[in-house]
Amino acid sequence: MTVVDLSQTLKTGMRVYPGDPSVKIVQVHNLNREGWRLKNLSMGSHTGTHVDAFSHMDKNGNTLDKIPPDKFFGPAVFLKSTDKLPNNKGLIFGKDRLRIEDFNKIISAKPLFLGISINCDFPVPLERKLLQFGVIIFGNLVNVEKLPKKKIFMFYGLPLKIKDGDGSPIRAVAIY
């Protein structure tokens, strides 16, 4: 069995989307003083490798706490936008260029979810439209080049259960 970690490491000062809050991770308690470690995390809900809830770009979309956990994992395949898309699988794209014109092709495949590499050109209008059509989107995936090409694997990207959450950092993994 192979496990591929598809997640960015969260750290103070890491690159974030322009206009998003910066990441600050501050030590609050430590072993010498209190006998345990505890850090305060401050960041946006779409920082690093994350998932978008439908409410991220749709005023009528469900928030994270309203989406069942079984929607955040499933069989997936790593491919290019020019490939034939399999039906009823998660679709993971690497260094690619998706376009708004790809919307119908993606929707007709009835994807369980979309995974987008940190190196993928993914336009906001396409993201918005997919979320409005009920497609969960995992963003800023890394190490996708380690995934098997056009072969099915299991993808897991469970978010924190944030009340009224529009997104959440995740620990994304693929297992094959």
Which residues are covered by each model-predicted region?
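Active-/binding-site microenvironments in catalytic and ligand-binding cores
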Residues: 1-176
